[in-house]
Amino acid sequence: MPLITINITEGMIEESIDHLQKTIHACFVRAWGIPENGGFYVINEYKKSRVRINRNMWGIQRSDQPPLLLQITSSPRSKELKIELFRVLAEELEKQGIRKEDLFISISPTQREDWSFGNGVAQLLQEEANSSF
């Protein structure tokens, strides 16, 4: 399951935050096939003045609105799956009024042994060991 950190500006109403998180989750289900009940989400709010970006980097004309920053920690995925996730997120979030030019996504791959979902246990390694019998 990926760990997704959603960084947004202060002041978004709770219903909008909830809708945003559900839309992002639906994108992961669609692009990566994660379970409907999967995924872990952390939502951080920051002050607009705390984000400083190059508004024209890579020839992308960003608006004066603060970007939506997504940080994804996940087991390794293929280049094709990453590209598909980027495309689906941009497409679906644009429907909510988030300009694709203002969407910043970073994926940090991890290995199975890098995860514990509680109890101080590496569940993914146990799952791997159990499937080898």
Model-flagged regions — what are they?
Residues 1-133:
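Interaction-mediating elements
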